[in-house]
Amino acid sequence: MELPRFATFLKDVIKEAGQVSLHLFKIMIPILIGVKILQQAGLIAYLAMPLDPVMRIMGLPGETGLVWATAMVNNLYSAIIVFLSLSESMQLSVAQVTVLSTVMLVAHGLPIEVKIAQSAGTRFLFQALTRIGGGFVLGWILHLTYSLTGTLQQANTIFWQGDVPAQPPPLPMWAAEQIKNLALIFCIILVLVVLMRIMHKLRIVDGLTWLLRPVLRFLGIGREAATLTIIGMVMGLTYGGGLIIQESRSGTVEARDVFASLTLMGLTHSLIEDTLLLTMIGAHLSGILWARLLFSLLVVAGLVRLLPLLPGGFVHHTLFAKEGEPSADRGA
């Protein structure tokens, strides 16, 4: 590649990565601050109280509601810290840890991740309820399956070797950590933008779409959203969702595909990192990977087939914005 062309290419990808990152940061920074305030004020514990009976239906001690509430409001790492602090007093089985880990994987980081999905054109309330409700239904199914078959009933073993902090880090340290995380997000998005351009140039995207055609047809996801969906499922909703925001604003991806893609990404994403993370506290792959993946595919396939049967007004009011209609925070 000639030097002037390379300079133009570099300028373009940095600009695109900057635009994607800026959209994400506008969403993430206020929510990060809000969640930190909730954490500092000790309010997350109150959010966990209504979850006590819900956790018991899934065969879990009521105390695990605090773990799931922490995951939903904050992130998996914070939830794991809470889990480790409670684990000695709870004496859970592998099946119970797998159920808890699976519901955490389906519904975590909701303020940021659902807001990202909304920014791309889906409806906030539906996405949030789908993930919370989906986590509960899947957790209940796993609980029944493990209980009726007598599977994974042995005492759980925790492999996590990290230290459990006695208290949250001071605010300056927390702020520095968030800035580092945001910088890392920009770097990863920059790499993804470069990879996407290379894959389009080499027609790798066309090859992937052809290979995944049966699955995409089953899910009702168009080829334009295929690669972005894969990125989100493998790497995380922040990255896949961030790229879809850019594509949806340019009109490249249809609203129906955005809805199907982001719903699938919401239910199952970060298939490698998050799955490995939860195995460190003893969760079994049968729940946190295979059941989660199968459940997510079936839910999205069912929703896509249900869409044509629903009134258009209900769909656009409840599920996703009309084609060309700005979402709640577009243009911000």
PLM regions with names:
Residues A107-P165, E273, L278-L310, T318:
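Transmembrane helix-loop-helix hairpins in multi-pass inner-membrane proteins
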Residues F25, Q39-L51, W68-F83, T98-V99, F124-G134, M173-A176, ...:
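Hydrophobic alpha-helical transmembrane segments
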Residues P61-A120, F218-L278:
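Alpha-helical membrane segments and immediately flanking helix-loop junctions
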Residues V13, P50-A69, W174, A225:
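Small-residue-enriched transmembrane helix starts and helix-helix packing motifs
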Residues M1-V54, I132-W140, L144-L216, L294, ...:
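Selected transmembrane alpha-helices and immediately adjacent juxtamembrane segments
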Residues I31, V35-Q39, F83-S87, A117, ...:
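Membrane-water interface at transmembrane helix exits
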Residues I27, I31-G34, Q40, I44, ...:
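Alpha-helical transmembrane segments of polytopic integral membrane proteins
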